[in-house]
Amino acid sequence: GRTNTPEFGFKNISDGQLHGNVNLPFDHSRNAGGSSGGAAAAVSSGMVPIAGASDGGGSIRIPASFNGLIGLKPSRGRIPVGPSSYRGWQGASSHFALTKSVRDTKRLLYYLQSYQVESPFPLKKLSKESLFEFSVSKPLKIAVLMDSPLKTKVSSEAKAAIKEAADFLSQKGNHLELVEQPLDGIHSMKTYCMMNSVETAAMFDDIEKSLGRSMEFSDMELMTWAMYQSGQRVLAKDYSKLLDSWDQFAATMARFHENYDLILTAATNQPAPFHGQFDLDETLQKQLRHMGEFSVSEQQDLIWKMFEDSMAWTPFTHQPNLTGQPSLAIPTHLTKEGLPLGVQLTAAKGREDLLLAVAELFEKEKQFKGPVYH
């Protein structure tokens, strides 16, 4: 089946002019998240046990957090890509699924993974032993990040979720250390927004060729139009520098994981938002409609402003997409209102086995919480 998403997967909620909002199954005044919101709602409502999803900046992990599900973004290169495109969003985007159990997550990962020679990012496959028989036999060193990489305020509920998970991991004999952000989160997010703009412009260039005409404002939603317009103005040399910065981010995190096995953060800063909570004001909408009239720097500032409120809601997820690391949202916390808000575990590239072994520890000790969990 096919599930609802925001147009081209640009948002951390699922709404749109075509099919409307995706409701959080247990509170229809709230959004199920995005961009894989329809998939999350299908799983959390019990329609299906597993639903395919993709994650270019948190689009699996964010709805997992809101819906009380397990959401794995695999390592770059783990899941097959192509043949139409081999580097979705320059490697930031990964395909996988939303699930309810670690068992299902492991099995799906084992059978979907591939060592893909023609891929620009081939990755050695995980063995059956590493996925199904590996267990944590010695204390882990876990870095705890309490602050937002975007310098935005972290909610008391997000802090509570981190503390609960940290306390549990500490009780199991692991060593946890509160650390500073290893990357410049604002800079990394700006590169991410620029990438989205350029890739949108490239996508519409192909669409124009297939349609035999130019794209118009009426062909797409406002936020998509703004991305399309701004992406056409970015210089090739600046895009090259952007991609080089991603390689530097990845190198920094590889060194970071020489000292730490895992990173623990909140998966989202808040539970599921209300429908319409991130609607843009009329002044900004007018500016976005006339995006082509602004300079490149002004356009990038407007893109940031366009996503500012929603980014503050979910500031923790984008960096693993840039570095290629595997990252996992698990349902370990309920807010005072009884709404899910997950935590996020991130490992070194290729270490999904470690992520899932730790997730299984939470699961076996009945640490998973949420309206749907069985």
Task: Locate the predicted segments by residue.
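Short glycine/serine-rich loop segments
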Residues: 1-112, 326-333, 339-342
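Short, well-ordered beta-to-alpha junction loops that form the rim of enzyme active sites
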Residues: 3-5, 10, 147, 181, ...
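Charged, often glycine-rich, active-site loop that binds/positions anionic groups
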Residues: 16, 20, 27, 188-203
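A short helix-breaking turn/cap at a secondary-structure junction
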Residues: 73-164, 186, 366-374
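Residue-level signal for inorganic ion chemistry
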Residues: 105, 142, 169, 242, ...
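Flexible, acidic loop-helix segments that line cofactor/substrate-binding pockets
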Residues: 120-126, 140, 145-147, 179-194, ...
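Acyltransferase
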Residues: 154-181, 204-215, 239-260
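Glycine-rich, small-residue loops and helix-cap segments
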Residues: 234-374
